[in-house]
């Protein structure tokens, strides 16, 4: 009788454990078995150390034909379930290529990109220009009907905002104001395919195109909802200008100019993104208050 096959022993990165031990403990426990399953199913050989963010485990692999690729293991949830669909909808330009995917688990096999992100571009203004040019091309694509909608997300935000009670009266007034603004935007919340997390770390260098976008959290909605992630990333570069408020406005204006997004809607939906992040944290991040002040959202 053959001995039972045991799953590969792996050391799960601490950041991944911290992110998922409460919400997805079963997924963490199944990772070794799941890794073996997809290595076998897609005829892959591991070729390097694990990479990871807070949400997924990235495994460098080589396909049977010798092609280098990345195996992405992640819990299946509302953010990940349409990732492959979104990337294939945008494909072949501007985004990483999906080589294989399993819709049942949101597991992806992706083309191997370089490890360099837009965070490595020394000039943050040039990095923003590159990001905005990519964004401008992505936001013209209609969203597939399977993708969840900004209309639903915004409706949930307004409902949750009604129950949020902050200690600071001024911050509470901002929450109430932003919720009112979002409520007015809901009837025209858009139908374009949005990335929802388009910041400098999610744009990687590539051999087939200078820069490619990775890791969307797909949403059907108004492109004006896309700007916020780039506003609050590479924050130290904004601070280093010596005039933080002006640097925020300059970055915002650059993205609006390149993408062609309506400025008033961009301001309104940026207030909505501030509200969303406050609802997630039950508090105002000082950076978000600074952005709100600089853009006169207060």
What is each PLM-predicted segment?
Residues 2-14, 117-173, 190-191, 218-222:
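A cross-family kinase active-site recognition segment
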Residues 2-47:
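Juxta-kinase regulatory segment immediately upstream of eukaryotic protein kinase catalytic domains
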Residues 19-23, 242, 276-298:
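ATP/Mg2+ or Mg2+-diphosphate-binding catalytic cores
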Residues 26-40, 143-196, 206, 257:
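An alpha-helical support segment within catalytic cores of ATP-dependent transferases
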Residues 32, 64-109, 116-138:
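A conserved alpha-helical element in kinase catalytic cores
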Residues 51, 56-62, 70-71, 98, ...:
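Active-site acidic catalytic loop and adjacent metal/ATP-binding pocket
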Residues 64, 76, 92-93, 106-124, ...:
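A glycine-centered beta->alpha junction motif in the catalytic cores
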Residues 206-253, 257-260, 290:
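Active-site Asp-x-Gly
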